[in-house]
């Protein structure tokens, strides 16, 4: 008898707790018809990372916090937009694959097609953030704002930058001033074009820069201020990924003194359908390396794009293959992958990368 009473008591307590939780949830995420709707796709990374100490900013586990907790940590967001959080993956961005990025792009395409969705935010690890951002910039043709955001400090750190970055990203995605600007990268109050923005430092907060192209704007008190009217980067094109099920393998080879020229052959034999060379200087490659590249182009009709290992620079058309011009190796790689997927010939790819 007493056991039955105790069981009933426990049941009632749990029922009350569930009701309280449901009430709290409904209060914490109210819908405001006057606010824009923003969908946040979560991919993991440092912004969702946790460490054992609030002083630890190096040794932590990325992708430890779910999208719900990330949103809850920034209550001011609900005054800016109605948020719909979607967990796509939850890992360090070094482990993301082209398949993951293709999946994300298709999810975003479906989301921006909804008339009630104003903008998109993607939380992402910073290690490969620029690659995902570039892919989205080349495949999502919409005027709606798409903002990729990350953090350099885990969520557990003193002075964690993730919450403010996320708040600013939602503010940018909610603003009509962000319309028609392509995919944007937002960290440390700066707004950059995905086409040009790159990570320049492995540790500091002010790591994402656009070098010669410059920032598009800044965020002050959750309001974006743009320096220019919306414009399309020179050389930017859109690829239709609706029928693409799998992206071809494209490898990046790094130039250095005494490089092994056979590495290019190995990459092709292991399945690479294209190569991007992070060449020395303005597309310098070793003589014996160029002999191998020439043979691969002749025998396999494989596209080879010459980029540069320098932080800035212009890859000229003096190289043996296709110059990437201002695109760094990692950005050129995704453009080449999409071109191959779309059936581009080598001549088409040359025209794609050229700056008229």
Swiss-Prot record:
Location(s), subcellular: Secreted, Cell wall
Protein family: Belongs to the asparaginase 1 family.
Chain ranges of the Asparaginase/glutaminase domain: 36-356
Keyword hit for Secreted: yes
GO CC term (a single one): extracellular region
Descriptive protein name: Probable L-asparaginase 2
Gene Ontology biological-process entries: asparagine catabolic process
PROSITE patterns reported in the protein's UniProt record: ASN_GLN_ASE_3
Main localization of the protein described in the UniProt heading: secreted
Enzyme Commission number(s) from the entry: 3.5.1.1
Signal peptide: 1-22
Organism name: Schizosaccharomyces pombe (strain 972 / ATCC 24843) (Fission yeast)
UniProt GO molecular function: asparaginase activity
């Amino acid at each position: 008898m007493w056991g039955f009473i105790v069981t009933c008591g426990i049941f009632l307590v749990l029922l009350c707790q569930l009701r309280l939780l449901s009430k709290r949830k409904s209060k914490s995420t109210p819908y405001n018809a006057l606010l824009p709707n923003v969908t946040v796709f979560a991919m993991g990374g440092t912004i969702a990372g946790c460490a054992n100490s609030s002083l630890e900013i190096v040794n932590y586990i990325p992708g430890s916090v779910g999208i719900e907790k990330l949103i809850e940590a920034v209550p001011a967001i609900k005054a800016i937009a109605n948020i719909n959080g979607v967990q796509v993956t939850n890992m360090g961005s070094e482990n993301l694959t082209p398949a993951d990025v293709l999946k994300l792009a298709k999810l975003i395409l479906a989301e921006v097609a909804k008339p009630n969705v104003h903008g998109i935010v993607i939380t992402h690890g910073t290690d490969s953030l620029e690659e995902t951002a570039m892919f989205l910039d080349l495949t999502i043709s919409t005027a709606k704002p798409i903002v990729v955001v990350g953090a350099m400090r885990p969520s557990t750190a003193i002075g964690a930058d993730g919450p403010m970055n996320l708040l600013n990203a939602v503010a940018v995605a909610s603003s009509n001033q962000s319309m028609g600007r392509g995919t944007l990268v937002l960290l440390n109050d700066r707004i950059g074009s995905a086409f040009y923005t790159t990570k320049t430092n492995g540790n500091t907060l002010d790591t994402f820069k656009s070098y010669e192209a410059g920032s598009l704007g800044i965020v002050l008190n959750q309001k974006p201020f743009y320096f220019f009217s919306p414009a399309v980067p020179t050389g930017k094109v859109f690829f239709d990924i609706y029928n693409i099920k799998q992206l071809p393998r494209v490898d990046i080879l790094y130039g250095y003194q005494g490089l092994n020229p056979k590495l290019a052959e190995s990459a092709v034999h292991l399945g690479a359908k294209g190569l991007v060379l992070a060449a020395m200087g303005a597309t310098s490659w070793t003589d014996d390396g160029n002999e191998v590249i020439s043979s691969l182009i002749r025998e396999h009709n494989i596209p080879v794009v010459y980029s540069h290992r320098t932080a800035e620079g212009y890859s000229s058309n003096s190289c043996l293959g296709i110059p990437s011009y201002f695109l760094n190796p990692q950005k050129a790689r995704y453009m080449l992958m999409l071109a191959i997927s779309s059936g581009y010939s080598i001549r088409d790819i040359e025209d794609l990368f050229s700056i008229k």
